[in-house]
Amino acid sequence: MGWLRFLLLVLVARPLALFLTGADVTGREHLPLKGPAIVAANHSSHVDTLLLLAIFPSRAVARVRPVAAADYFLRDPVIGWFSRRVIGIVPVARMKSGQRAQASGEDVLAPARAALAAGDILVVFPEGTPGDGDELGQLKSGVARLAEAFPDAPVTPVWIQGAGRVLPKGEAIPAPLNCAVLVGEPMAWAGDRHGFMAQLRASLLALKAQAPPLRWS
């Protein structure tokens, strides 16, 4: 990671994310400090990415790379530069509704697997796009395919509470409000995609149940 990205993350993005969210973090000790590793979090706002980058220690943030939709984050040269150079995204193509990766002939997870092979810590949002509020949506199986390809890589579930109120879906201006981040114990690949996804969903919902009440509600 270049010094520019490191300085912007530590000196700009981290203070901004902490100011906007308060970042009450539980279970920080479960965060992976080296890769290959996967962090799987719920997704209610674009603030989620900055918040997750903010809670990693400086010695590990160099390897943290969020998986993001190429068509959204690379649609504009300025946004694309910031997304790649500062946030450090791993851009992947999104399949159209009802389209399967196998049918399209495109290996959409190839960039993510390459990042894991390089020793990165991937941040993935299995719901895909930000949902509405703090309810967990349907999880896509891409994270299971990554875990299957790298069975020794830990998969750490994370529940983010309240980010959807800091920057609701469709809004452009954030509002400083308190959020909670709950980091669960890492999961290991057990050889079955369906079982893995069920375990991940159960882990995320268990973390959600432990989240404190929203202080501004």
Protein language model annotation of sequence segments:
Residues 18-26, 104-106, 163-165:
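Short gly/ser/thr-rich secondary-structure transition/capping motifs
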Residues 42, 69, 127, 160-162:
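Cofactor-binding loop segments of dinucleotide-utilizing enzymes, especially the Rossmann-like FAD-
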Residues 33-98:
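Catalytic core of membrane glycerolipid acyltransferases/transacylases, capturing the structured
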Residues 13-43:
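Helix-to-loop junction immediately C-terminal to a conserved catalytic motif
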